[in-house]
C-alpha cells in the first residue's frame, strides 16, 4: 500500500511529503505513490539526529523540572545503535564511532550548560503526534486527507506570560544566515495550524487558547572550544608574563621586582592565591553552537496557510490521479536525490519499476 494512503479510504500527507512534492513531483510519485525507497536508507547523520531528538525528549519531560540528562540518554542509545544489525556499516571504523559518540556527548553537555534547566519552561508534551483531517477541492469534486506528523515539544514560557510554543529540534553542521527563510517556512506554518486543534482535542490547552509561536532549536554539530574564557565569556590565548603580573598585583599579592620573576614562579604564585590568569582575548572567537529562532504566525497568516495547503492538496490529488502530468524539476540537487538513478533511466526511456535495478537497490511497498 503506498505510504500516501493510511487505509483504503483515508489518505494522509506529512510536511516532508508536501515539501518533496513542491520540490519535485516525480520524486514524490516514486516515494509516496509507487512506494519506493532505497534499501540502504540508514545513514550516520540520520541515526545521530534521531538520537539527539530522543535525548532531548527525555530531558524535556512534562512539567517544569527536567528529566534524564540528555548526554546519558544519547550515550545509551548510541551504544545500542552501534550494534544494531540494521545500522551495519554506518561507522568507518572504531575511531569514527568514538569521534561521533564524543561529539554527541559534548554537544548535549554544552546545550545544558548554555541553556540551563530552564524552569520557566513548562513542558506540556514532548513528541506529540498529530493527525488532523482537512477537506479540499479536487478538479472534479471534493476529498479529504489527514495532515500527519510529530511536534518535538509543546510548552508554556512562563518568562513570557505563559505563552504557548512549539519547539522543533534541528542539528546542523553550521549556524548561518541560511535560516533567513524561516519567516516563510511552511513546516512552521503547517505545525502551527494543526497544533491548536490537536492540543484542544486532547485537553492539553484551553478551548480558547491558540498556539502562535514555533521555535527552531538549533544545535551545531561541533565540539566545544576548550580554550579558557574570561569573565566576559571571551576565549583567551595563553597568558603571558605581563598577564600574570597584572592579575597578581590587582589581587593585592605583594611581589618585589615582579618583572624579574620567572613565568613558572608567577604561575605558582597565582595557583597559591587561587587566581585564574587569562591572556588576551583571541582574535578569532568561536561561533555560537546553539541558537533558537522564533517563527510566529498570526491568525490571518494561519488562515492563508490553510488556503495554500488546500491548493497544494488539489495539485497533489490531480497528479496522483494522473489528471495532471507528473513533472520533474532538474536542479543541482538532483545528484543528492535518492531516485537519481531511476530518473536517469526514466529519461532514457528504460525505467522498469519491476526490473532488476529496483529489486536490487530499492524496496517497494505492495
What are these regions (language model features)?
Residues 1-366:
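RecB-family 4Fe-4S metal-dependent nuclease core
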Amino acid at each position: 500500500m503506498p505510504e500516501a494512503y493510511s487505509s483504503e479510504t483515508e489518505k494522509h500527507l506529512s510536511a516532508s511529503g508536501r515539501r518533496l512534492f513542491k520540490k519535485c513531483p516525480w520524486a514524490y510519485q516514486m516515494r509516496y505513490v509507487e512506494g519506493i525507497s532505497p534499501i540502504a536508507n540508514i545513514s550516520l547523520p540520520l541515526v545521530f539526529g534521531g538520537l539527539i531528538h530522543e535525548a532531548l525528549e527525555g530531558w524535556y519531560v512534562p512539567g517544569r523540572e527536567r528529566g534524564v540528562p540528555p548526554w546519558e540518554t544519547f550515550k545509551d542509545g548510541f551504544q545500542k545503535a552501534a550494534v544494531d544489525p540494521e545500522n551495519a556499516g554506518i561507522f568507518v571504523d572504531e575511531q569514527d564511532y568514538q569521534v561521533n559518540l564524543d561529539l554527541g556527548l559534548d554537544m548535549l553537555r554544552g546545550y545544558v550548560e548554555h541553556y540551563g534547566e530552564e524552569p520557566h519552561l513548562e513542558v506540556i508534551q514532548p513528541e506529540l503526534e498529530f493527525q488532523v483531517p482537512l477537506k479540499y477541492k479536487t478538479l472534479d469534486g471534493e476529498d479529504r486527507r489527514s495532515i500527519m506528523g510529530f511536534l518535538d515539544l509543546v510548552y508554556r514560557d512562563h518568562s513570557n506570560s505563559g505563552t504557548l510554543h512549539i519547539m522543533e529540534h534541528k542539528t546542523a553542521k553550521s549556524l548561518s544566515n541560511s535560516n533567513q527563510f524561516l519567516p516563510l517556512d511552511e513546516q512552521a506554518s503547517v505545525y502551527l495550524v494543526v497544533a491548536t486543534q490537536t492540543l484542544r482535542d486532547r485537553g492539553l490547552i484551553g478551548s480558547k487558547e491558540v498556539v502562535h509561536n514555533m521555535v527552531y532549536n538549533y544545535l551545531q554539530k561541533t565540539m566545544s572550544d576548550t580554550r579558557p574564557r574570561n569573565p566576559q565569556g571571551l576565549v583567551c590565548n595563553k597568558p603571558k608574563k605581563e598577564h600574570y603580573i597584572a592579575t597578581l598585583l590587582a589581587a593585592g599579592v605583594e611581589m618585589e621586582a615582579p618583572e624579574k620573576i620567572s613565568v613558572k614562579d608567577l604561575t605558582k604564585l597565582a595557583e597559591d592565591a587561587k587566581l585564574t590568569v587569562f591572556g588576551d582575548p583571541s582574535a578569532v572567537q568561536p561561533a555560537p553552537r546553539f541558537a533558537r529562532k522564533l517563527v510566529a504566525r498570526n491568525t490571518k497568516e494561519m488562515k492563508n496557510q490553510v488556503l495554500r495547503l488546500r491548493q497544494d492538496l488539489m495539485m497533489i490529488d490531480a497528479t496522483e490521479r494522473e489528471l495532471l502530468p507528473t513533472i520533474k524539476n532538474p536542479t543541482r540537487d538532483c545528484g543528492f536525490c535518492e531516485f537519481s538513478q531511476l530518473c536517469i533511466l526514466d529519461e532514457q526511456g528504460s525505467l522498469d519499476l519491476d526490473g532488476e535495478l529496483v529489486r536490487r537497490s530499492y524496496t517497494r511497498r505492495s
